[in-house]
Amino acid sequence: MNKEDIINIIYLAIDDYNQINPNSLIAKESNTLLYGQDGKLDSLGLVNLILAIEEKLLDNFNKSISLADDKAFSEKTSPFSSVSVLADFIYNKIDDK
Amino acid sequence: MINKSNQQVILVTGTSKGIGKLIAEHYLKLSNNLVIGCSRSKSSISNNNYIHYELDLSKNSAVNDLMIKIRKSTNRLNVLINNVGVASMNHLLLSTPEKIDQIIDVNLKSVINLTREASKLIKKEKNGRIINMTTVASPLNLEGESVYVSSKAAIEAFTKVTAKELSAFGITVNAVGPGPVKTDLIKNIPTHKINRIISQLSSKSYTSIDDILNILDFFMKKESQLVNGQIIYLG
C-alpha cells in the first residue's frame, strides 16, 4: 500500500462526504484544507470523514486502524489539516504496524 | 448479503437465554425483521431470520470480530439492543477484584465498545436506534449491589451522553430499567430480598418480559425520533 493508494482512499471518503453535503463540496486535491484554520470540515464533518476513511481502509486493504487516537490530537500540526498531511499521517500509521 | 434491503436488522446481545432470548424471539415473530444475536454459548434459537455468533463481548477483539461478520453478512444495522449483562449481589467488602473486573468488562466496557463500532453501521440507516439495559436498582441505590449498580449508573450516563453525540447521525439512544424479572440473573437471590426491592417500587410487582418489550417497541417506533437520552424504569 503506497501513498497514492492512501490519497485515493481519502478521495473516496471525500466523495461520500460530498454526496451528503452537496452545498459544501470538498475539492479532491492534495492541498485541500480539511480541518482547522480555513478547513472545510466542522467537527461533525471530520468525524464522518475519519469514519469513511477507516471503513475504506478496511474494505479495500484489510487494514483496521483508528485514526483519531491520542497521538493524533496531541501533535503540533493537526494530522487532519489537509489531504496531503492526512495522507502522510495514515501512511506512517500503517507503516508503524 | 443475506438480508433483504427492506428488512430491519436488529442486533441483540446475550441471546442464549433469559431476557435477551425473549427479546430476539419477539422481534422474530414480527414480520420483516432480521435478528442477529450473540452470546458466549451456542444459539438456542432456530429461525431462518436469525443469525447467531458465539463470542465473549467482554474481549475487545470480539467486538471487532462481530462487526466484521455483520458487515460481511448483512452490511446493515438498524437497531442495537445492548442486553448482555452480569449481576452480582454482594457487599463491596465481599466483592473480589476478579468479579469487579467481570462486571465492569461485561456491563460497561462491552457496551461502550459495541456501541462505538455498531454506530458506524447504524448511522448509514435512517432512524437508527440504540437501547441499553439498566435496572431500578440504580435509582434505588440498593445496598449490597454496589459494583453492579455502579456499572448500570455508568450505562445511564453513557446513554444520556451518547444520545447527544449520536443524534447528529439520526440515532437515538435510550435505556430501559426493569424491576426484578424472573430470570437466571436473580435466581440465587433470596425471596425476602427481592420482596424488599419490590416494596420500594411504585408498582409493587415483578417486571414481566412484556413490560420490557413494550418499552423497546416504543423506543423503536419511527415516531419516537425525539425520544432520546431517556431512561424508563419499570415499577
Where are these regions (language model features)?
Chain A
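Phosphopantetheine-dependent thiolation modules in NRPS/PKS and related acyl-activating systems
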Residues: 1-41, 45-48, 60-97
